[in-house]
Amino acid sequence: MKRKYPYSLAKGLTSTQIAVIVAVIVIVIIIGVVAGFVLTKGPSTTAVTTTVTSTFTTTTTIPSTTTSTPSNTVVFYTWWGGGDGGEALSQIIPAVKQYAGLQMQTYSIPGAGGTNAKYAILALIQAGKPPAAFQVHYGPEMISYVEAAPNGIHTFVNMTPYLIQWGLLNNAVYAVLQAGAYNGTLLSVPINVHRGAVLYVNTQLLREYNLPFPYNFSTLVYDTVQLANHGVSPWIIPGGDGGWDQFNVWEDIFLYLAGPQLYNELIYGTLNFSNPTVQKLINETNYWFLNFTSYNYPGWQSMSWEQAFALIAQGKVAFQANGNWVTNYASYINVTVYPPLPQYISNSSVSVVETPFPGTQHYYALVIDTIGIPVGPQEQQALQLAHFWSSYQGQEVWTKYKAVTYYKNGTDWYAQPAQWYDYQQLINTSEQNFVYQLSDGGVFDDVFAQIDSGLLTLQQVGKVGLSAWNSTLVSSMQQEQNEWLAAAKLGLGYLGFPGHPFAGYYPPWVTNPSAYGLTNNTQKTSNSVMLFLLPFLALPLAIASIDNKYYLLK
């Protein structure tokens, strides 16, 4: 399935386009419901009811959000459902009701990585009927909404003072907040941290053929060839998610070859494609991408990432590159996923291990789910929801089945052994070794769609498509840079806080703004800086009004 969006989120949409998008989203959702929901427990589709709980709904219409919504009800738009966050939602919804006194209505719009949900949310915002709260990634993704919204940044609640008040600036892993701060301004609230750039390995297959565990890239290549020689399909890289899985594989290979700084330059579109070293790295990445995809499981074209993991769990393939949301899905189908430690790799009863993509074990690819809150009639309820969900108490409930927490003093409350390993890696990774995963919020939404489409096509056609793919990559990165420059004019020109950029990297328009037609004022300051520097100043009455509940903060 090939998805391509010819318009840019950053450019805004006409009312006609909005209507078309809403109609398309509704049709997509109806198709998903008829098919038995987007998520399945394996390659064979099993129909499930569309209502997971009384408050968790796969919607077939776009519900309006108006002042008639009950005062204790909050509407949350998401792409989670079934195995991808469904279990965690079933736990957080009653907790929100018990501790925050809110009835949480969750509308799920299926699509890997938010492919469909992002456009439905945007359409509602542009139509002046935003949801009370919505799921959004950290990284530049949130700026896509800012640049397209009718009132720009003023469409959304500035969350910086709230996160200060709630203690996250002091108690969360700092890199997590840097990944969502735009020159010091935080526009959404983190609720979990996923790890991208991981590889799922069926260790029983490796034992059957006496093959070593792929701790490094050369071993991964060796295992791939040996498994193929034994008639086993080494890889499953599904195509049913529109190119998102291909993007995962390509970026993981690039991270191994190029390291974190050059990877983070892709976030800003500043990678120098004229540099011979960069050209060599891109060529090598393309080579290994085509190499691994040539060993793909038959029928990959129509499969989703969930169906792909079912093949891993069943021992039909050895490798799947993705993020650790797959580990949460494993809980849904009753599969235990273990970390890459010797006692598990050598254990004959262990079948699935999650490991950092070979060669990237010292890096941490962040994928951070957050809550965005539009200014509107349900703003206070949405703030109450975000307050509880982001609290230590809320994190114990939510991240048991979803990703890991960002609190620096968390304990092992997780459902899967691999989650605790990922959490320990998170709190012990050096600042310069973080990246923000490109395929899950690390690029603007229109760039994301272009790269997805380009890589899916490259896998389909092979080497003859390299020239077209390279052209797509270069033009996409130019678009990425242009959209960051537009953000810079709004004072949102980089990830991080003044003096503390994400991963220690400033894009060049921050260090040399005049070369990009910018002024120093648009780069070095933002309206939230004083709030960041002076957290003990009196805060707005709105904060006090939602701070009347105490949530456990250890």
Curated annotation (Swiss-Prot):
Activity regulation as described: Binding of glucose is strongly inhibited by galactose and mannose.
GO cellular component, one term: plasma membrane
This protein's encoding gene: glcS
Coiled coil: none
Residue stretches spanning the membrane: 18-38, 526-546
Domain of life: Archaea
Full protein name: Glucose-binding protein GlcS
Extracellular membrane side: 39-525
UniProt keyword terms in alphabetical order: Cell membrane, Membrane, Sugar transport, Transmembrane, Transmembrane helix, Transport
Topology term for the membrane: Multi-pass membrane protein
Complexes and interactors: The complex is composed of two ATP-binding proteins (GlcV), two transmembrane proteins (GlcT and GlcU) and a solute-binding protein (GlcS).
Organism of origin: Saccharolobus solfataricus (strain ATCC 35092 / DSM 1617 / JCM 11322 / P2) (Sulfolobus solfataricus)
Function: Part of the ABC transporter complex GlcSTUV involved in glucose uptake. Binds glucose. Can also bind galactose and mannose.
Family: Belongs to the bacterial solute-binding protein 1 family.
Annotated localization: Cell membrane
